[in-house]
Amino acid sequence: MATNPTMLTGLSGNVSIPRMTSTSTAYFVGESGSPTESQQAFDQVNMTPKTVGAFVDYSRRLLLQSSIDVESMIRDDIAKVIATKLDNAAIYGSGSSNEPLGIKDTTGVGTQSISTFGTFAEYIGMETDVAAANADVANMFYLINASARGALKSTEKASNTAQFVFENNEINGYPAIVSNQLANNDVLFGDFSQFVIGMWSGLDLTVDPYANATAGSVIILALQDVDFAVKQPGAFCFGT
């Protein structure tokens, strides 16, 4: 994702990230008075490795007939497929069936009803929802898909103003990043520094010429161990 998430690499075992759920309290006091004691409260965001993988096998005949580097082409394709799968899971992951939990279904993430590709007022509603959670304005982005971008380029903020919702790669002053991982009529807005990507490994690629040697085919297997977490769910709003 091109939204500057927090990256944790080289992890081992399960990981717990401390999260402050309430702050201490300040008081005005009289001369020689003492403020009342207060304490922060903490909980933890837990991350456990989830494995995403893909494999293909290709024949000896394909190697003989092709003038290109087939193995390199297949490796590149597998890497792109896994990256695309991870991008989708970061947004829509169910948290079940060995899949990480994505932003959309994380408890505490704000929601906003979106009509078709959204009105200017609906986008302002998303911004207000996130700002009320004291998210970091400097790290806020919109994620929209290419169809939404096209529609919003001709959607006026108000009638007969010639001012459009999407201008200069921004929506209302916030960067708008286009990702076709977003379904039509879905919009994600928030402080993406609060989204954590944990990686227990790089992309592990294995070339196996032996398993199907009698058939003359070669297997390429790719595996990667990752998990996602949202440190401050209120820093996001999902529109749909």
Regions found by a protein language model. Give the residues of each.
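Extended oligomerization regions of viral-like shell subunits
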Residues: 11, 16, 94-227, 232-235
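Acidic/polar, low-complexity extended loops/arms that serve as protein-protein interfaces
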Residues: 1-137, 177, 183, 229
